[in-house]
């Protein structure tokens, strides 16, 4: 017999709907430029504005990119797919309907594997990924007038909506899922997934499972959460909603009956979700097949062509980096976070055997520049071969890591190679043992207090003496040899 002390805590069940804007040159059903920004309503035409008599012409690249995404998400690809009209009225939708996919999505029954902090993995099932067009953007003025404007530039932009099963059981898992999905879509090159520009948008469906004393569970009404424009906001919104739903259940006892789903918006300034409306059902949208677009028959050849476009994805790349280059899992995770950075690192490794040093230079020196100047690795000025030259100078013992940082700075300033800078400025490590011994002896004689501290077992004393040696040699002392000499002289 169980008792009340055995009752489990309430837990969430979460499903995510993620819209990504595809990076095609033109929109989904017209020839307007598909690009963020520009003057309001400058990238529109009669087709994307829904003018009478205008017919859509499908952009084939949208299909190809969607199939590629399906392969990356382990989905089945439909051999026959079609478009449908999703009917609703809103100021940002000039046609009064959205061209979407209802019962025959291009991709279905897939999964995405996320990695937990403890190294275990979990598969989140993908219900479907379907093609659709974007709506415009409402701009609400904050000048006290309550006026709103509509920018239709985004109207008709191609979207891929990925819908997960409710397999996610915590806000942290939700964020891991989103980050993994974003990483994959960026790797395969179908979207830049910039949340600030709206090219990745997420809605979360959440309800709470409330265990009962008799061992059963009840399910609170589902809430769809919108207006989450960052991963941190997704986490905060879900955490708030978990508490709100449990408190609401304790007050009212209301459970999910299939008709009481609501839509709520996340208010970042207050950290709360706010009721917006009762959620529409599928029947409210009055889906019907798009009469101006034929069914699409997808051949095996097209499906295989897109499979061949699939690059090595982040998870297997990380495992290979650890095995092939002997770097840590953390470094592999950071290096593989962007395909461009991963490729740059591998280009460095093609010209050196000192893989760990290469990893250190890329992750510390180069990434510091990227962050400070807010640039990407593609915009970084030093070729990978020149970085490999710097790594080889350090790995071969020609210069110390201390001098290496100075050489890197001079490479940035002058564009010269590491070899040229080391030669021109005589920066190679000292190879005269007698000179090194004299310098070490002089440092010991000049610092009796540190010598006394060393004999008392204070670790920092040796580091201080070593620093003095490096200072006197302007970083040209071999640190291993200098340390051995100091220890031998100190006894």
Language-model features: locations:
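Strongly charged, low-complexity linkers/loops
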Residues: 377-388, 392, 401-471
């Amino acid at each position: 017999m169980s008792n009340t002390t055995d009752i489990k805590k309430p837990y969430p069940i979460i499903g995510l709907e993620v819209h990504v804007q595809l990076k095609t040159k033109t929109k989904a059903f017209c020839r307007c430029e598909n690009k963020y920004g520009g003057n309001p309503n400058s990238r529109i035409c009669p087709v994307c504005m829904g003018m009478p008599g205008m017919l859509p012409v499908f952009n084939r690249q949208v299909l190809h990119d969607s199939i590629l995404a399906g392969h990356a998400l382990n989905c089945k690809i439909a051999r026959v797919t079609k478009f449908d009209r999703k009917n609703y009225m809103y100021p940002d939708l000039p046609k009064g309907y959205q061209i979407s996919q209802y019962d025959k999505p291009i991709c279905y029954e897939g999964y995405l594997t996320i990695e937990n902090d403890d190294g275990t993995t979990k598969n989140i099932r993908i219900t479907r990924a379907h093609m659709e067009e974007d709506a415009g953007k409402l701009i609400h003025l904050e000048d006290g007038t309550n006026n709103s404007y509509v920018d239709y530039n985004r109207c008709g932009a191609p979207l891929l909506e990925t819908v997960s099963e409710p397999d996610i059981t915590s806000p942290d898992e939700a964020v891991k899922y989103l980050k993994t999905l974003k990483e994959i879509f960026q790797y395969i090159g179908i979207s830049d997934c910039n949340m600030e520009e709206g090219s990745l948008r997420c809605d979360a469906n959440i309800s709470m499972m409330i265990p009962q004393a008799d061992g059963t569970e009840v399910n609170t009404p589902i809430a769809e959460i919108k207006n989450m424009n960052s991963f941190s906001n997704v986490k905060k919104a879900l955490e708030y909603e978990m508490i709100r739903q449990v408190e609401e259940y304790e007050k009212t006892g209301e459970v999910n009956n299939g008709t009481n789903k609501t839509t709520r918006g996340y208010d970042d300034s207050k950290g709360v979700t706010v009721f917006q409306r009762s959620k529409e059902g599928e029947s409210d949208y009055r889906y019907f097949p798009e009469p101006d677009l034929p069914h699409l028959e997808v051949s095996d050849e097209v499906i295989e062509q897109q499979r061949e476009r699939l690059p090595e994805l982040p998870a297997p790349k990380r495992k290979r980096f650890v095995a092939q280059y002997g770097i840590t899992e953390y470094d592999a995770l950071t290096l593989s976070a962007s395909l461009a950075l991963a490729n740059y690192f591998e280009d460095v490794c093609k010209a050196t055997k000192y893989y760990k040093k290469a990893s250190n230079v890329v992750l510390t020196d180069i990434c510091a520049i990227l962050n400070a100047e807010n640039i990407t690795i593609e915009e970084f000025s030093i070729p990978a071969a020149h970085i490999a030259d710097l790594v080889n100078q350090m790995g071969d013992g020609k210069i110390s890591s201390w001098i290496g940082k100075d050489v890197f700075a001079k490479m940035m300033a002058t564009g010269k190679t590491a070899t040229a800078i080391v030669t021109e400025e005589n920066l190679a490590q000292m190879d005269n043992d007698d000179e090194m011994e004299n310098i070490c002896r002089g440092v010991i004689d000049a610092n009796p207090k540190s010598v006394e501290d060393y004999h008392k077992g204070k670790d920092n004393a040796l580091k201080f003496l070593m620093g003095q040696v490096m200072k006197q040699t302007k970083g040209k002392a071999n640190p291993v040899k200098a340390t051995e000499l100091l220890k031998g002289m100190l006894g």
